[in-house]
């Protein structure tokens, strides 16, 4: 899949070059891809454990609070995409319930010289079918307290999470998260894996997949199945011997 994704990007670039008469033909079409064989990737960790989540939250609370430390904490109290956190706006109707109605993304455009422009921020509908991805989530008290703290730090901002008057960036969010994981000796997983973590914690606690689906903003249950069921507790290596004794 990764190879095909990269091939599609290259194919688009070379096709653009042919259409603009920069080159005469696309070399991608001559690649003998049908004979290629790929080794399956090793299984990778897709979620923080409950213990790692608790360690991160406890540690983050000891730091000087800013929009990034608070946004990382906030991510662990819901099932959000990082772009949805960046695009969150103030809701004065109900403090406990947030409406996820947009995401803030950084986009680049392919220029005539075949280079990409500097990223520019765009507010868009949440990823996927808006009928499902625009949704509400009820927050625990800890999540509400984070919003209250952000209101103190950013009382007049158009967006909830703003750092020094500017919207957050995904790169800085993940760079900070990686830094804090390193300081704790925890394996770093990106912001998107926090979504896996929280969805799996709900599933482990007995919440049905069909009830987790709307919280993730998914249009079908099959997509949700990919997120839930990740390991959030350490495996008991003695379990088999005990059961089969």
Description of each model-found segment:
Residues 2, 6-10, 67-68, 81, ...:
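Hydrophobic (often cysteine-bearing) scaffold residues that line and stabilize catalytic clefts
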Residues 18-29, 95, 106-110, 149-157:
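Proline-centered turn/helix-capping motifs that create local helix->coil transitions or kinks
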């Amino acid at each position: 899949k990764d190879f095909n994704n990269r091939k599609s990007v290259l194919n688009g670039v070379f096709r653009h070059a042919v259409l603009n008469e920069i080159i005469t033909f696309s070399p991608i079409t001559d690649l003998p891809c049908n004979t290629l064989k790929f080794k399956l990737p090793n299984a990778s960790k897709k979620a923080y454990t409950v213990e790692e989540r608790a360690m991160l939250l406890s540690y983050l609370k000891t730091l000087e609070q800013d929009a990034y430390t608070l946004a990382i904490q906030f991510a662990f109290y819901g099932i959000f995409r990082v772009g949805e956190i960046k695009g969150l706006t103030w809701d004065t109707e109900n403090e406990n319930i947030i409406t996820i109605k947009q995401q803030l993304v950084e986009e680049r455009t392919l220029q005539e010289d075949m280079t990409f422009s500097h990223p520019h921020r765009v507010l868009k509908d949440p990823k996927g079918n808006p009928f499902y991805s625009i949704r509400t989530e009820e927050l625990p008290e800890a999540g509400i307290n984070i919003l209250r703290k952000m209101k103190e730090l950013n009382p007049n901002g158009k967006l909830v999470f703003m750092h020094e008057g500017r919207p957050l960036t995904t790169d800085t969010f993940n760079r900070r998260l990686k830094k804090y994981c390193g300081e704790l000796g925890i394996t770093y997983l990106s912001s998107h894996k926090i979504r896996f973590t929280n969805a799996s914690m709900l599933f482990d606690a007995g919440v049905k997949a069909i009830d987790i689906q709307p919280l993730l903003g998914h249009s079908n249950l099959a997509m949700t199945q990919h997120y839930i069921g990740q390991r959030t507790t350490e495996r008991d290596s003695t379990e088999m011997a005990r059961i089969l004794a």
